[in-house]
Amino acid sequence: FLFGGVEMDDAGAGPPAPMDRRYSKEEVWRATEQIIDTAVLCEGLGYDSFWLTEHHFQYEGYEVVPNGILLGAVIAERTERLRIGMAFNIVPQWHPLRLAEDFATLHNISGGRAILGVGRGTVPREAEVLGTRIGSFDNPDQAEDDRLNRLQFDEAMQVINLALNEERFSFHGEVYDFPPPGIPDRGDFVDELTLVPQPIHPFETWQAVTSPPTLEQVPRWGWGGVFWNNHPTFTRQNWDRFGEVWEEAHGRALERGEKRMLVRCVHVADTYEQAVDEVRPGHDEMWKFLGPYGWSKGYMGEDGKPAAPGLIPGLEESIDQKIWLVGTADDVGEQIEWYRDLLGVENLMLFPMMPGDSYTAVEDQLGRLATDVLPRFS
């Protein structure tokens, strides 16, 4: 999984501030080409899947892919086996039927290799420009924005599921009305729609799980849940609750790692000390960028409860909390094995490129992981 950003020679905890960065259109496009090349490399190294993200208007250079489905089509043309996922399509920022059409096209053109990854969004600059609002379940001041975002997401996903799976469909909700009444068509009126194309291969749907309501909803829908940036104690609680809700909803117990995916930032070097030195600038740049959006709320505070909003963790804290896996190949392998023992992890998404890293560095990381770490789990 890559954020997909521009190379930076000044990443780290100090200046410049994220909002003070600005990159040229040529630098942004060069990063886009390097992302595609990295996907091709992943296929050659034997990785199962390659995940892109969706972000908009990021002149700061951290995440320069606005449409992972479109870029995924290019990757599909240049690969034969690699599965292509979106982590995540921000559903409320799309017209749901356009998202369904585009996903079905990618899935079919790739021979069934696309993975539908969905999320609700985190960035107001993107959300409010593209037709939705962003709130926070645990912030009373934003509760109404959160409610509206969830309503929009829920209805959009109902539309998408109908469109992808039913030959004919209609949907009439509070937010979406498809087809709206009174559309004339050759002497009659339109009362149902058919998506063209529809998927001709089975597909998976995965959603980021970052709040209690989402934890209750995703397994009821029958999708996979993606867990990231949480202390293992919180991850285990959520992981187990996901399984409980799944069994309640579907009458079947999941295997320990089934329908759940763990995401971990990772960095491998010849020695532990070297790994720490190499990853620190990207780690610190990442939290300088993401901390204000509340991404560190899954860290554990000194009282054993979730960390206070706005925490900017240091690298040692991220390592101690087992949220970042850093060290030699043996160190990282042992930490992955620890998570397999704790959770039964079978779906592991690795994040080997920190903000600002060079694509030469990520090529090295992917090679080390594929050669020195992952074979022990095959």
Write out the residue ranges for each language-model feature.
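Hydrophobic faces of well-ordered beta-strands that scaffold small-molecule active sites
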Residues: 1, 50-52, 83-86, 114-118, ...
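N-terminal beta1-alpha1-beta2 module of alpha/beta enzyme domains
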Residues: 1-81, 203
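An alpha-helical appendage that flanks or caps ligand/catalytic pockets
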Residues: 1-23, 137-195, 234-345
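Active-site mouth loops of central-metabolism enzymes
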Residues: 17-33, 89-97, 199-210, 266-269, ...
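Conserved, mostly hydrophobic/aromatic
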Residues: 42, 46, 54, 75, ...
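Acidic (Asp/Glu)-rich catalytic clusters
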Residues: 43-44, 73-80, 103, 107-113, ...
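Alpha-helix-loop-beta-strand connector modules within alpha/beta enzyme cores
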Residues: 62-86, 152, 367-378
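A conserved active-site cap/scaffold subdomain adjacent to cofactor or substrate pockets
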Residues: 208-234, 238
